[in-house]
């Protein structure tokens, strides 16, 4: 029987790993000693860094969408299924209809924004971390002529630079439309500077000041009143807005939470040097599924 390597996840990290294994183990695959399987929960591969370009109508959604089977190496067996549980003690993946044994597993299930973490947030906020969210925000921005845009950020979240990026892009977007003086941009962050990394905060702060972008630190959102359009912080401060853009705290994929492999937020304890799941000799973790405190981008996943 060939050794079976299963890559769980069809995003950038999982696809890169599957393709690299397919090339490096080409001979073993052709000789039947190794089998490489990628399990994706959708036939569509969406390039997530493109969401910001969709938000500002610089590209249409289809520009960032490919069929997953067009992106994987011929040595990779591609399966579309929604795995709901991982059982490491049995070397087994489970879905509603199938079971997938493995000898080695690479978990590349990413992370997702948790809009339910703050009462009222799901009903009130716009986002740019999902395809649907970026389209919805694009349409909302196109209708704005004046008012206050409030950006709230919670941690952890993927792509650490994205909140700063969208804020600067909003400034540019409204300047190009000739209505920047009618728009109040307010950026918030939960700690004592506008980014978790000091060098980035040191660079971004004067950029905000030069562009008349207001910012508020130690801003920790507690709840949102969608009807009154008010964001309330843990300190009890009320902030009115005309449009709320939120980066909520992210959490691990449902399969990780369901399998109890991660911490309370569903991020998997991972050895930073080997990328092995802590306590395992045959499970590896890449990208946003790990609990590693580093900036994770597509090209570092």
How would you label these PLM feature ranges?
Residues 45-48, 114-117, 254-255:
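Short acidic/His/Gly/Ser-rich catalytic and metal-binding motifs that mark active-site loops
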Residues 2-76, 156-195:
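Beta1-alpha1 glycine-rich phosphate/pyrophosphate-binding loop at the start
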Residues 33-37, 76-93, 174-270:
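A Rossmann-like FAD-binding core segment of flavoenzymes
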Residues 121-145, 238-301:
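FAD-site-proximal beta/loop scaffold in flavoenzymes
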Residues 10, 97, 109-110, 235, ...:
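Glycine-rich, N-terminal phosphate-binding loop of Rossmann-like dinucleotide-binding domains
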Residues 38, 78, 125-127, 215, ...:
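Conserved beta-strand scaffold positions in the cores of enzyme catalytic domains, especially
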Residues 1-4, 76-165, 172-178, 245:
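FAD-binding core/adjacent interface of flavoenzyme oxidoreductases
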């Amino acid at each position: 029987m060939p050794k079976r390597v299963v890559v769980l996840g069809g995003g950038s990290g999982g696809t890169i790993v599957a393709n690299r294994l397919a090339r490096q183990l080409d001979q073993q695959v052709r000789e039947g000693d190794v089998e490489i399987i990628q399990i994706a929960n959708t036939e569509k591969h969406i390039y997530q860094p493109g969401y910001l370009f969709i938000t500002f109508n610089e590209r249409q959604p289809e520009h960032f969408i490919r069929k997953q089977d067009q992106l994987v190496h011929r040595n990779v067996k591609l399966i579309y299924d929604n795995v709901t549980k991982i059982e490491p003690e049995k070397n087994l993946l489970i879905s509603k209809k199938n079971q997938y044994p493995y000898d080695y597993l690479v978990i590349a299930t990413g992370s997702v924004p948790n809009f339910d973490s703050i009462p009222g947030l799901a009903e009130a906020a716009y986002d740019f971390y999902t395809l649907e969210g970026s389209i919805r925000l694009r349409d909302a921005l196109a209708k704005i002529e004046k008012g206050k845009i409030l950006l709230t950020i919670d941690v952890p979240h993927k792509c650490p630079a994205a909140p700063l990026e969208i804020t600067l892009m909003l400034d540019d977007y409204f300047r190009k439309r000739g209505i920047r003086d009618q728009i109040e941009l307010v950026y918030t962050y939960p700690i004592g500077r506008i980014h978790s990394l000091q060098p980035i905060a040191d660079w971004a702060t004067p950029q905000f000041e030069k562009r008349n972008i207001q910012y508020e630190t130690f801003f920790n959102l507690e709840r949102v009143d969608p009807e009154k359009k008010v964001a309330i912080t843990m300190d009890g401060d009320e902030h009115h807005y005309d449009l709320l853009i939120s980066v909520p705290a992210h959490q691990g994929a449902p399969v990780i939470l369901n399998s109890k492999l991660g911490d309370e937020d569903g991020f998997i304890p991972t050895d930073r040097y080997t990328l092995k799941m802590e306590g395992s000799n045959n499970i590896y973790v890449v990208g946003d599924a790990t609990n590693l405190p580093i900036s994770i981008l597509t090209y570092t996943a």
